[in-house]
Amino acid sequence: MTDLIDATDRRILHELCANARIPVTELARKVGLSKTPVAARIRAMEEMGLITGYRAMLSPIRLGLIHVTYVEVRLNDTRQKALEQFNAAVREIPEVEECYMIAGGFDYLLKVRSHDIAEYRKIMGEKLSALPHVAATSSYVAMEAVVEQNSPSL
């Protein structure tokens, strides 16, 4: 990425990550350019796939989704077809905020958000345990979010 964008692009991205609704004129003032080149740079970064979209950031706490659990998942089959089946099925569970395939002592790490432990237990029993090829799971309840970043460091 360092060859694709310069310091001005990084400043633009930094400002957009902080406030995607910033008017282009204000953004231009902050980065020291006029409106037209800033708009062109944004369009170019969208076209090259650096900016993939703009979305509202919701407060899970305000929505009552205060319970976060990380779940280790071990599969009984890790051939490609089994992985594809698991991937497709886990994408259908809205409570799963993040899912990563892991190299290590287990196969996947899920971040699951729910209202409380009772709801999590239901999600585990009815949805996660029923995913294709699941052999075992281990749950870790988060007690406090110490760092939560919504964008990569530039």
Swiss-Prot record:
GO biological process, one term: response to amino acid
GO CC list: cytosol
Entry annotated with the keyword Transcription regulation: yes
DNA-binding region location: 24-43
Record flagged with keyword DNA-binding: yes
Cross-referenced CDD domains: HTH_ARSR (cd00090)
Lineage top rank: taxon: Bacteria
SMART domains in the cross-refs: HTH_ASNC
Pfam families xrefs: AsnC_trans_reg, HTH_AsnC-type
GO molecular function, one term: sequence-specific DNA binding
Keyword line: Activator, DNA-binding, Transcription, Transcription regulation
Cystine connections: none
Purpose of the protein: Transcriptional activator of the putA gene in response to proline.
Designated name of the protein: Proline dehydrogenase transcriptional activator
